[in-house]
A protein has these predicted regions:
Chain A
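Conserved acidic carboxylate
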Residues: 9
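The feature encodes the CheY-like receiver
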Residues: 15, 57, 75, 87, ...
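Charged docking surfaces used in two-component/phosphorelay signaling
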Residues: 16-24
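Short hydrophobic/Thr-rich beta-strand motif most characteristic of the beta2 strand and flanking loop
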Residues: 26-33, 41, 103
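Hydrophobic residue at a beta-alpha junction
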Residues: 32-33, 56-59, 68, 89
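Active-site residues of response regulator receiver
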Residues: 53, 83
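C-terminal output helix
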Residues: 107-116, 128
């Protein structure tokens, strides 16, 4: 059984790239183009990992992360922020909002999966390795 | 005269007095009638006239009835022998007696009127009055009345002038001879007699008798022999004795005439006139002389009395005292005065100023004393003399010595040295002048006012100048007059509450021209001309007040300006802040917007090269790698530019982390390992064990080390890159050592400038933005550390960073 990854990203190219990369790396990918959809999708499919863009329409990544962390059913899912917000303090802001990891764009396909999985909790990493 | 009258009244009973007057008058009249001209009552010497005048003078006007009665009886007696009918004799006697009485009354009245001495014969003035009024004028009245009435009743007008003249002369002689004896006898002091005096008297009487006999009964021409005899009497005996002697001589003279007359009837009248003149002149001469002598004697006596009375007191006084008589001859002096003249006090009597002083000085003293005697008033003077260059002051007091009549008979002079007092006074005066000067010329306006009435007592010149009032105007004013209405009441209250030295506060004063000035005053109580007063110093603070107001205004203005400026700055600051925020937002947006397309470029090329979508031929791979490389270069360029911009805009915020440098270096090695491996270079780390954790910005420290390591790898073709970490001087030192090209010494300084890559020739060979070292240097500075380089061409370079263990940026 594949791990489920939810990607919340408004940029179609990025969405396509991450989806392609994750699928190629044996992930089941769910897509959401805004925050509300993302939270709905997370509620419905209960992903193993959430890749979260920060700059999003209507509801930004920080808000989504906080919302997710406030949900009892979802607060254990690792959230990895993938963002072009590479300014000083952005990382800290992201982590403070509840994210588990931070990968700045542009991503490097050579080590992206490795970096993402380095933020996984032990139990999830074991499951991933068993696959 | 009061005294004499009361003495009389005591001695004699009034009634006895009257009887005595009548008897004596009548008896002397009987005697006189013996010598009377035939058929008349006119006698060559009419003694009763003297008795009448003396009685009125001594006992007063009230005794006149006795005189009248006696005169009437005497006349009656005298006329009864005439051929006139009795009633005529009666009337004639009454009229003649009236003349006799009037004679005494008028004579005595006139003498008393002009002489204030009870005994007129004691002074020259009184004696003159006695002779003129009593002996010459008054008898004329009696003679006129008597002669005229006699001729009317008898009708013997042919003897009128002869009668008148004899009557007048007879009365005159009677008065001149008898009145002085009675008057002088009244005051005569018998106790002054002693044996010596009595012996002299006996001798004198013998001489007198012998002389009289010689003259009147033998050699008539020797009449001048009387002169020494009478002078003896005058000088050696008193007035009374002399009067008696005059009477004796007169009696002898008349008796001799009568004796001669019997022998030579033809010459009788003529001889009587001659002897009358002789007696009259002798009497007058000796009356005058004796009065003068008496006056002198009495004056001498008074002086002597006044001297002896205070003698001991005067002797002991420190003052110098002398007494001069009215002729300015010294009479006496005390020892101090004698010492001044270098003589004994006993030697002074009889001397004058001429005996002691140079003539001009003596002349001067004489003039002063004469003027003093003439004024008769007490004189106090201060005399200044200069002797041997020294100034001496003498206080001189001259007191007139007066006799019982108030006439000045001498000078009592008292003088003493007051030089010291004068010097003290002068000193005082100078002092006073000094302080007066201090007050009057004081540049501060000063005023003195009465504490009770608040009236001005004095003000100084500065005050007059300041306020414009004249001195007279000020002295008519009160303190509140200077103040505006609204301050007057408060001022009076304050003025009454001040004590001692006090600050009187801030007030307004109105000057004469109406202008108002602001003042402050300080005052002090003082005693001014024996009244409670207060001196106040006034300071005009009008200008200061104006300046204060101006300053206040300026201060306000400044405050406003500051407020305005602050507001402006606030706005500017807000603007700047918003510009900063704008810049931050711009940088963030740029960063974000540039990364998004790069994400696709780098991401997709990466994925294509992984051949995830499908297999690629070699040419495709080669081209995709080139694309990937360009994308990565572009990304690092963007990162560097953003970093530099942030640093220069002050937008780079540093975080404070506690970390181990070994971890950071391991991360760098891990990250750079693929690059080193690709160039076949050895990348190693050598970290001193037990390095302490440091406090700094971990991300930035790592960024700098990555930069240095990547640079080293970039410029090294063969060999190795080594990273060392060690502790040195409480600083963490990280060295990145390569075996690369090395850097020329003159290039080293340029290294850390932006967009510099050493040797533009190889620049193109080594890709990079040229910003790395510049950013690294700036970051190190921000972190409180430093970066430096050591290099040797062709051998390699060593980049060294030093970081404080505990950062406090």
């Amino acid at each position: 059984m594949k791990l489920k990854a939810l990607i919340i990203e408004d940029n179609e190219q990025n969405m396509y790239m991450l989806s392609f990369l994750l699928e190629k790396n044996n992930y089941e990918v769910f897509q959401a183009f805004n925050g509300l959809d993302g939270i709905k999708a997370a509620t419905n499919c209960l992903p193993d990992v959430i890749l979260l863009d920060i700059q999003l329409p209507e509801m930004d990544g920080y808000q989504i992360a906080r919302e997710l962390r406030n949900r009892n059913d979802l607060n254990t899912i690792p959230i990895i922020a993938v963002t072009s917000h590479a300014m000083v303090g952005d990382r800290e802001k992201v982590m403070a909002s509840g994210a588990n990891g931070y990968i700045e764009k542009p991503i490097d396909p050579d080590n992206f999966i490795q970096r993402m999985e380095s933020h996984f909790p032990k139990e999830l990493l074991q499951r991933r390795n068993q696959l | 005269m009061e005294d004499t009258k009361s003495t009389f009244a005591k001695r004699w009973h009034w009634f006895i007095l009257l009887i005595l007057i009548i008897l004596s008058y009548y008896s002397t009249a009987k005697l006189g009638l013996i010598f009377a001209f035939e058929g008349t009552v006119a006698s060559p010497v009419w003694m009763p006239a003297g008795i009448a005048l003396a009685a009125i003078l001594l006992a007063g006007y009230r005794v006149w009835p006795a005189i009248y009665i006696a005169a009437f009886l005497a006349n009656l007696q005298g006329l009864i022998v005439s051929e006139l009918p009795f009633h005529s004799i009666l009337i004639l006697s009454l009229i003649t007696a009236m003349g006799n009485t009037l004679e005494a009354l008028i004579g005595a009245g006139l003498i008393s009127r002009f002489s204030n001495n009870p005994n007129p014969l004691e002074t020259l003035k009184g004696t003159t009055l006695f002779i003129f009024f009593g002996a010459l004028l008054a008898p004329l009245i009696a003679a006129l009345v008597g002669s005229s009435s006699f001729c009317i009743f008898t009708n013997h007008w042919e003897i009128y002038d002869h009668l008148l003249l004899n009557w007048w002369f007879g009365d005159t002689l009677g008065i001149l001879i008898l009145a002085p004896i009675i008057i002088n006898w009244n005051q005569y002091k018998f106790n002054e007699w002693n044996y010596l005096k009595f012996a002299e008297l006996v001798g004198f009487i013998i001489v007198l008798g012998f002389t009289s006999y010689l003259i009147f009964f033998t050699i008539y021409n020797l009449i001048y022999l009387f002169i020494p005899v009478l002078l003896w009497s005058i000088f050696r005996f008193g007035k009374f004795e002399t009067s008696v002697f005059v009477l004796i001589i007169s009696g002898l003279a008349l008796w001799s005439i009568m004796h001669h007359a019997i022998n030579n009837a033809l010459q009788q009248n003529e001889s009587i006139l001659v002897i009358q003149s002789f007696v009259g002149i002798v009497a007058i001469t000796f009356l005058v002389l004796s009065s003068v002598i008496y006056e002198r004697k009495k004056m001498q006596l008074s002086l002597y009395e006044s001297l002896t009375k205070h003698r001991s007191l005067l002797e002991n006084l420190p003052q110098k005292i002398f007494v001069k008589n009215s002729n300015l001859i010294f009479v006496s002096c005390n020892e101090n005065f004698a010492k001044e003249l270098n003589i004994q006090s006993s030697e002074i009597a009889g001397k004058t100023d001429y005996d002691f002083f140079p003539i001009d000085l003596a002349e001067k003293y004489r003039k002063e004393d004469s003027a003093f005697l003439a004024s008769g008033k007490l004189l106090e003077t201060e005399v200044c003399e200069t002797r041997a260059g020294q100034t001496y002051w003498t206080q001189v007091v001259k007191v007139p010595i007066k006799d019982g009549n108030g006439s000045v008979i001498g000078i009592q002079g008292i003088f003493w040295d007051i030089t010291k007092r004068k010097q003290a006074e002068e000193l005082l005066r100078l002092n006073e002048e000094k302080y007066r000067f201090l007050f009057e010329r004081n540049p501060v306006p000063l005023l003195i006012y009465d504490t009770e009435t608040l009236k001005f007592r004095a003000v100084n010149e500065a005050f007059i100048k300041q306020y414009g009032f004249s001195m007279d105007e000020v002295l008519a004013m009160q303190l509140p007059d200077l103040y505006p209405e609204e301050e007057k009441e408060a001022l009076v209250e304050v003025a009454q509450g001040l004590h001692g030295h006090a600050y009187a506060g801030e007030w307004h004063h109105i000057r004469k021209d109406g202008s108002v000035i602001s003042i402050i005053a300080t005052s002090h109580d003082l005693d001014y001309m024996e009244r409670d007063a207060r001196i106040a110093a006034v300071t005009d603070i009008t200008d200061r007040k104006l300046a204060e107001m101006e300053l206040e205004r300026y201060h306000k203005h400044l405050e406003n300006m500051v407020e305005e400026r602050t507001a402006e700055l606030e706005i500017a600051k807000e603007r700047a802040e918003s510009a900063d925020q704008l810049k931050s937002a711009f940088l963030a947006t740029m960063s974000h917007e540039l990364r998004t397309p790069l994400n696709s470029i780098i991401g997709f090329t990466g994925m294509l090269l992984q051949e995830l979508p499908g297999p690629l031929n070699e040419e495709q791979k080669k081209q995709l790698r080139m694309t990937q490389k360009s994308g990565r270069h572009l990304l690092s360029l963007i990162n560097d530019i953003l970093d530099l911009s942030k640093i220069e805009a002050g937008q780079l915020n540093l975080s404070t982390d506690r970390f181990k440098i070994s971890e950071v270096i391991q991360n760098v090695i891990d990250l750079s390992k693929p690059f080193a491996t690709s160039k076949n270079l050895l990348l190693t780390a050598e970290i001193e064990p037990d390095l302490p954790e440091i406090t700094s910005d971990q991300f930035r420290v790592q960024q700098v080390i990555i930069n240095l390591v990547n640079n080293a790898l970039k410029f090294t073709e063969v060999g190795s890159v080594k990273v060392e970490a060690l502790l040195q001087d409480k600083h963490l030192v990280v060295r990145v050592i390569d075996t690369g090209l090395g850097i020329e010494e003159n290039q080293i300084t340029k290294l850390f400038k932006p967009f510099i890559q050493i040797d533009s020739g190889i620049a193109r060979k080594h890709e990079g933005t040229g910003l790395g070292l510049s950013i690294s240097k700036k970051l190190m500075t921000m972190l409180g550390g430093s970066i430096s380089v050591e290099s040797e061409l062709a051998k390699g370079s060593t980049f060294i960073i030093r970081l404080p263990l505990d950062n406090n940026y």
